Amino acid sequence: MDAADTAADADTAADADRAADADTAAEAAALTGEQQRIRRTLRDLLAERTGPEENHAATATPEGYDPELWARLSAGLGLAGLALPAKYGGGGHGPAALALACEETGRALAPSPLLATAVLAAPLIAALGTPAQRAELLPRLVDGSLTSALAVPGGSLALALGLTGDNTAEDWSGGGRAGGIQARAVAAGDGDGSGGGGWRLYGEAAQVLDGHSADLLLVAAHTGGFARSRTLLFLVREREGGTPGLVRTRRNALDLTRPHATVELRDAEAELLGEEPADVLGALAATGRIAAVMLAAEAVGAAGAALDRAIAGLGPRARPGHRTAGALQAARSTLADLYVRVEAARSLTYCAARESGPGPESGPLALAQALEALRATAGEGVRLHGGGSTGEREARLFYQRAASDELLFGPARRLRARAAERTGLFGEVAA
């Protein structure tokens, strides 16, 4: 490699830095002062407390995350309550502020209960809970003293949230047949819970995010048999010394920063979330649309970090003997294409987050774009760094996040197919 090639590499790196600075300035101009403060403070804290080694140590704990860091994120920065109403101790900022926070935690691949607690569980409690349940649970979720997880039968989380199919059309919760999770009333009355007593749950939920460590489980279960078939949400509380009938087993995960568990309910005592009648399936779908935006923000943050590492890793490869001029030019062109994909995903995510009420398609479409951008960027990072290097091991962590999220919430093609179905792109508009 000659001096001209080396100079060209230096110019390319400088151009990339200038482009990144320009994008950062443009993003900052579009954010409010409060949102800029949230991003800056959170990024500084995560830079101090996270990294490949720190994250690995955190995932090895019984909780699967760093409890001290979570306390600072929730009680200190108010992350868990950013989008919750102020009367419960939340920030009342709406989805946009929470999406910014998710982008930063995604950039750091920080293991935390943020997704399970603040994105999936808290909105359901706020939407369906009785006044007493909201007053009891939401302030504790906000300050981080209580963590929660959403448990649905089998591996049907994406379907239950309405992301990959119509959650009203398929019997994902059990459908009155064997399997799924079944709920039965234990009080006198008509036998379906209207007698005012408690409930018992029997069944199994797999791939429950943070299900091994959450203090409170929100369990989707089927009840009513064929006569009054319906899906309800129940609260299963962790008791000191263990909850009778509740068995939680942490499973090996493709992405260690996304720990999940199998939850077995063997005639476990439960409390109905809210009151009947309630539009549980509608609340799950609404939560799914918001969750898609937050997952997209995480994926965009991770994709941006993976791209930064790939660009940085290209520098050492430019030394004489490592690559030919043609190979370096091809790598630069690929990174430029990836940069466009990441920025397109970021734009879609920001647009979805800023809508006053995300439409049925904006969140899932942003998630599909972001997952594909993350997978492509992380994959290129693995290829550029080469096998066995430190950079390759770090790039692989981002690829594992992309693959894990697609398994849990995708894949991207099904997210897009469901969006097309809902808009009637290929026929009648779906429910």
What spans do the regions from the language model cover?
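Asp/Glu-rich intrinsically disordered low-complexity tracts
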Residues: 5, 9-11, 15-17, 21-23, ...
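Glycine-rich phosphate/cofactor-binding loops in nucleotide/flavin-utilizing enzymes
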Residues: 2-4, 23-27, 39, 385-431
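Glycine-rich beta->alpha junctions and the first turn(s) of the following alpha-helix
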Residues: 27-33, 38, 246-343
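A short, Trp-centered hydrophobic/proline-enriched beta-strand micro-motif
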Residues: 143-170, 174-175
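Internal helix-loop-helix
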Residues: 74-144, 213
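A short core secondary-structure module
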Residues: 151, 180, 198, 202-246
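C-terminal helix-coil-helix/basic helical segment that borders enzyme active sites and/or dimer interfaces
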Residues: 5, 17, 50-61, 315-323, ...
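Flexible, small-/acidic-enriched active-site or ligand-binding loops
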Residues: 164, 168-169, 174-176, 207-210, ...
